[in-house]
């Protein structure tokens, strides 16, 4: 009888240990999201109106901490909280106001509504 109880106790301890290891391994494999992730993306535009529109679109996404677009190199410099948004969220917001990015393009309908000086050469 002692052997049966001892064997069951050993089996219980072994199963408990394996379950804890499996749970701990899953936690380690999860990717920790950065609260201050920095990205630079190319956004088409021409003027100060474009700059204001692009930056406002980026800031409309919850989790964007900083958004600065430069006319000279057409780069949007971002700092985002990846726990609240993704880079794709920002690209979609920018495209929704008429400005193409590398991954998301504005619809023709929205692009045509841009002011004349804001229309850029589309790829």
Regions found by a protein language model. Give the residues of each.
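Bacterial Sec-dependent N-terminal signal peptides
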Residues: 1-25
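Sec/Tat-exported extracytoplasmic proteins
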Residues: 62-65, 97-103
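Surface-exposed aromatic
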Residues: 71-79, 109-115
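Short acidic amphipathic segments
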Residues: 54-70
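Short amphipathic alpha-helices in soluble, non-transmembrane regions
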Residues: 54-56, 89-98
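Sec-dependent signal peptide cleavage junction
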Residues: 17-42, 88, 104-123
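Short, surface-exposed ligand-recognition loops at beta-strand->loop->(often short) alpha-helix junctions
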Residues: 41-50
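Helix N-cap motif at beta-to-alpha junctions
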Residues: 81-87
